[in-house]
A protein has these predicted regions:
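Short amphipathic alpha-helix that is part of the acyltransferase structural core
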Residues: 1-38, 54-56, 162-172
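Short alpha-helical
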Residues: 20, 72, 114-115
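N-terminal charged segments
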Residues: 25-52, 145-152, 156-159
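A conserved beta-strand-loop-helix scaffold within acyl/acetyltransferase catalytic domains
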Residues: 33-83
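Conserved acetyl-CoA-binding loop-helix of GNAT-fold acetyltransferases
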Residues: 82, 87-101
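Conserved GNAT acetyl-CoA-binding A-motif
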Residues: 101-114, 128
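Conserved active-site tyrosine of GNAT-family acetyltransferases
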Residues: 119-121, 125
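Conserved catalytic-core motifs of GNAT/GCN5-like acyltransferases
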Residues: 126-156
Length: 172
């Protein structure tokens, strides 16, 4: 994957490209144990609903940021991946800004205190309890982690450090 100086970032991907984008994401996920697998079906749904922010290096997928709906006006900022060839603050920030624009309110979790602090200081997130994250997401935040395919991943991650549950409210 040859790095361009500025990857193209979009969440409005033409329908005829959905199959290729999903295949590339699944191929990248299969090679990296840190990527939480998502089904082809859920990725296609996210693409169809403009809830998958994708970074392209030339025409290849170089990163993605998944937004999972939690009801009207609320979404969970799911997994983000940026390929090392294009990794940098600008790509990540552009992807994050595009993801935050999807709904007025977002919930997220990280186990990296430094990253959580950056989100709080620079983007206006606030730290909340697990109960508050569940309430804001109308229970979806917990339900997703209890799904059979994701429970093992959730348990491994929660045992790896302190969880920082975060909520973002878009400024009015």
């Amino acid at each position: 994957m040859a790095a361009l100086t500025t990857p193209r970032i979009s969440r409005s991907i033409p329908a005829e490209q959905h199959g290729r984008v999903v295949a590339e994401i699944l191929a990248l996920a299969a090679t990296d144990p840190h990527i939480t697998a998502r089904s082809a079906r859920s990725l296609r749904r996210a693409l169809r609903d403009d809830r998958l922010v994708v970074a392209f290096d030339d025409e290849s997928v170089a990163g993605w940021f998944l937004s999972e709906p939690c009801g009207p006006g609320v979404h969970e900022l799911g997994f983000i991946f940026v390929h090392p060839s294009v990794r940098g603050d600008a790509v990540f920030i552009d992807m994050l800004n595009l993801a935050l624009a999807i709904d007025g309110r977002a919930v997220s979790v990280t186990f990296r205190a430094d990253f959580a602090g950056w989100l709080i200081r620079s983007k206006g997130f606030r730290r909340v309890t697990l109960g508050e994250a569940a309430r804001v997401s109308r229970g979806w935040f917990l339900l997703r982690r209890l799904a059979p395919g994701r429970l093992g991943t959730a348990l491994r991650r929660t045992s790896s450090g302190e969880a920082w549950y975060l909520v973002y409210d878009r400024p009015r």
